[in-house]
């Protein structure tokens, strides 16, 4: 791998790390404007759960910013765990929506809205993992 493509990869990773640095902004966004953006998949939209989720993300952001040992690995592990929850959500949420269609249409509409709202957070985690794993493989 030449130096120019390696530098470009590091620049993309630095850009992806800003997601962690801006965790308080994402928490406010999810709390007031976009419920279910990212933490809602894991916490079900609970405000305290969201606060805990974004506290972990902010802590990872601080660790990455200060170049703490294992910060990048911890961020990778956090995103892998998040994607495990996402996989469960992707597989079972449509079944829950289908089962709720018969009785309660208000709840069904809310579940559909939450499903759509969480897609950008899922996509971000997938992109993050691809770049981090690609970097780990290229360094070895």
Stretch-by-stretch model annotation:
Residues 2-140:
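Topology signature of small-to-medium multi-pass alpha-helical membrane proteins
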């Amino acid at each position: 791998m030449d130096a120019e493509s390696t530098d470009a990869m590091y620049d993309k990773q630095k850009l992806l790390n800003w997601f962690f640095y801006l965790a308080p902004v994402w928490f406010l966004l999810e709390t007031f404007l976009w419920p279910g953006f990212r933490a809602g998949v894991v916490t079900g939209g609970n405000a305290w759960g969201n606060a805990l989720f974004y506290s972990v993300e902010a802590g990872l952001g601080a660790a990455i910013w200060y170049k703490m040992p294992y910060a990048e690995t911890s961020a990778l592990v956090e995103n892998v765990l998040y994607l495990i929850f996402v996989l469960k959500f992707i597989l079972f949420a449509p079944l829950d929506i289908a089962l709720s269609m018969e009785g309660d249409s208000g709840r069904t509409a809310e579940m559909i809205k939450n499903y759509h709202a969480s897609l950008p957070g899922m996509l971000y985690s997938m992109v993050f993992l691809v770049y981090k794993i690609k970097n780990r493989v290229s360094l070895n």
